[in-house]
Amino acid sequence: MSMHDPISDMLTRIRNAQRVTKASVAMPSSKLKVAIAAVLKDEGYIEDFAVTGEEKKPVLDIQLKYYAGRPVIERIERVSRPGLRIYKGSNDIPRVMNGLGVAIVSTSKGVMTDRKARAAGIGGELLCIVA
């Protein structure tokens, strides 16, 4: 079976694993998924991540983060999807929960947070929001 939206699959796996308080979650790896995981780690939403497995089929393993028994990620949603891509300029990138959350943006300079994209003055595809 082919996967039509690997980013949505990644976010769903994280959401489902946190609902049952799993320590980690594994998924097929790609460069974009690793970049998103790096942003989540930099922002403190996950403990760590690692790419394991053989070269033909790498596996992304994400260590989930909890605080007082509750998941750190309260909400994680896909915004731009294959059927409806959402592109925003640097001035139009939304602030998630008035700055408490983060929007992950794919720009020409790589995958970054909404704050970094606004500071750099570049827009891009709005991949997902995390709060």
From Swiss-Prot:
Source organism per UniProt: Laribacter hongkongensis (strain HLHK9)
Protein purpose: One of the primary rRNA binding proteins, it binds directly to 16S rRNA central domain where it helps coordinate assembly of the platform of the 30S subunit.
Annotated family: Belongs to the universal ribosomal protein uS8 family.
GO cellular component, one term: ribosome
Protein name: Small ribosomal subunit protein uS8
Subunit organization: Part of the 30S ribosomal subunit. Contacts proteins S5 and S12.
Gene name for this UniProt entry: rpsH
NCBIfam families, per the entry: PRK00136.1 (NF001109)
GO BP of this protein: translation
